[in-house]
Regions:
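Non-transmembrane, aqueous-exposed alpha-helical and coiled segments at domain scale
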Residues: 1-281
């Protein structure tokens, strides 16, 4: 079996481009969800608000400007084939790409070197890197910038198994209720169910990488996604909290096996600017 060589410089170049693209161009599925919401929204103020969000997207894409002033933490996901060898340091390559991308596009630097001493690193590094080993020789990079307004509204709980699916529904709806207008709705929810405390949180983040027009492959969870989406939109919070039928654009659930005595649930809240961009090197 042959090994494919990937130069670390190629990874740096890809990450640089993806940081810029993710911050200036919304993924087609999220943009389509916004367009669909605008077409279906019956409340005049909500419809007007959605129209302003659409206009903002167009200006950002046309002028290569950030969609939002919070250009986020650089969350980088790499699907790395087991038959790939990287010539160079992967972590350094990713961080250099983030550094260049945020500098080149004049994106806001939002990372502190220490969570309590609060000294800004000045270049939006370090990136938050997750590597998934997969079969083959693929090297797929996804950059998903994540802003603090929605991240701060995210929650995790350790339910009792007896709480069951109703406990999951209640926790998700309570999370949205507590968040209110803070995460700049219409929101997107990444939900992790199962695993361990740490794996569940990572699973919720991973769920945000799935296109909104691709429901869970398991019909049971696909139905739960739809049920939660309808319930959240029935709250009437609406775009930016001004009221309306569009509080949420999509719910994406990912699930894992778990301990017989556990039922972890994590909700990673994302704003209407759910950013991600991918490339293979």
């Amino acid at each position: 079996m042959s090994i494919r060589e990937v130069n670390a410089v190629a990874i740096t170049d890809a990450v640089e481009e993806l940081c810029i693209r993710a911050n200036t161009q919304l993924p087609p599925d999220v943009k389509q969800a916004l367009d669909n919401a605008h077409a279906a929204e019956p409340w005049p103020l909500a419809r007007q608000t959605l129209e302003l969000l659409q206009q903002n997207l167009c200006v950002a894409a046309e002028k290569d400007l950030p969609i939002c002033q919070d250009t986020g933490m650089a969350c980088v996901f790499i699907e790395l084939g087991q038959d790939v060898h990287i010539n160079g340091n992967l972590d350094e390559a990713v961080n250099e790409g983030v550094r260049r991308g945020y500098e080149k596009a004049y994106l806001r630097k939002s990372i502190t070197a220490d969570p309590l001493q609060r000294v800004n690193t000045g270049d939006n590094t370090p990136a938050f890197l997750t590597v998934h080993l997969v079969p083959g020789d693929v090297c797929k990079i996804t950059v998903a910038p994540k802003g603090a307004g929605s991240e701060n509204m995210s929650r995790l709980t350790m339910l009792k198994p007896a709480d069951g699916v109703q406990g999951v529904k209640d926790f998700v709806k309570e999370t949205v209720k507590q968040a209110g207008a803070n995460p700049c709705p219409p929101i997107v929810l990444g939900i992790g169910i199962g695993g361990s405390f740490d794996k569940c949180a990572a699973l919720a983040k991973k769920a945000l990488l799935r296109p909104l027009d691709q429901p869970n492959a398991d019909p049971y969870y696909a139905a739960l996604e739809k049920e939660l989406l309808d319930a959240i939109n029935a709250t009437g919070f609406g775009p930016q909290g001004f009221g309306g039928a569009t509080t949420c654009l999509g719910v994406c659930i990912e699930q894992l096996p778990t301990h017989v005595a556990c039922l972890p649930v994590a909700v990673n809240v994302s704003c209407h600017v759910t950013r991600r961009a991918s490339a293979e090197v």
